[in-house]
Amino acid sequence: MAAAADSPIPSQIKGWVYSEYGKASDVLKLETNVPIPELKEDQVLIKVIAAALNPVDSMRMIGFFKVNDTIPTVPGYDVAGVVVKVGSQVKNFKEGDEVYGDLNEEAHEFPKKVGSLAEYNVAEEKVLALKPKNLSFAEAASLPLAIETAYEGLERVGFSAGKSVLVLGGAGGVGTQIIQLAKHVFGASKIAATSSAGKLDLLKSLGANLPIDYTKVKYEDLPEKFDVVFDAIGEPDRALKAVKEGGQVVTIVAPHPTVPFFVLTSTGTTLEKLRPYFESGKVKPVVDPSGPFPFSQAVEAFSYLDTSRATGKVVIYPIP
């Protein structure tokens, strides 16, 4: 794949574009004449090999962040690919480097008009990291936004060795990474996580001591309470009933009067910090088994993502 760095760089590229707000099946169209993004001095130009979808992509597409958004837009935050050109101030990357990252440093504040669902895009050096050699492009693309969100959330609540955590939505893109980070990086004493019955074995394999079938068990009624509850599905009121006195709840879904809510600040530093865990296999990408979806099936991939039934991440590969 590194040979892509030697290919001529076109002035127009293929990309999935929406020019009005709505769900993907109504507004997302494949275009062949998307202007290639202009490279700034602190950016690299990436030949995209793989991308992953996130709920924030769908939220942007339906117009949830209109005030900070512009259309037409190519969606996509997570990217993995090959550097084909570097800006004059870039220090850590060179042409031919295999990189991955979350393209948007601030998820909701004027995100890039050309996201990862295009043949090429640009990204600031600081949001990228070198792709671990043992990960495929598809696996690498599945990680950045989810694992950076998981890591930042655990750090924000001061999670540390010996503490217990309950993960709401343990089989999702962020949840699968919270479990692994809590176990292998932060040293959790106990990890509970919720999912449907068919995904309980996955939770165990990732490191959960107490997998909970949310269709049968009300986690907030369990006699055991937790030092931290990480809400990745939008149930802060129930989460508050499951946390110990003096413990903390954090949510990534929606602001709440008494629960800390945060929006990820993307940084390649987190990916570099976690590199040893990826390379050792202690922390693994979780790619939904329905995929990867080919580039031509981006609309179908979004439709699947929007069911909220995906396991881990929905990945688009290869691109184009």
PLM feature spans:
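Glycine-rich cofactor phosphate-binding loops and adjacent beta1-alpha1 units
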Residues: L166, A192-S195, D201-F262, G268
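NAD(P)H dinucleotide-binding glycine-rich loop of Rossmann-like/cofactor-binding domains
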Residues: D102-G169
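Eukaryotic N-terminal low-complexity, Ser/Thr- and Lys/Arg-rich leader segments
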Residues: M1-G22, P320
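Mid-domain Rossmann-like dinucleotide-binding core that forms the NAD(H)/NADP(H) cofactor-binding site
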Residues: E139-K216
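C-terminal hydrophobic helical "lid"/dimerization subdomain
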Residues: A3, L271-P320
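Short, well-ordered loop/turn sites that connect or cap secondary structure elements
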Residues: F93-K94, F159, V243
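Glycine-rich beta-strand-centered segment in the early N-terminal region that forms part
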Residues: P35-L53, F64-E106
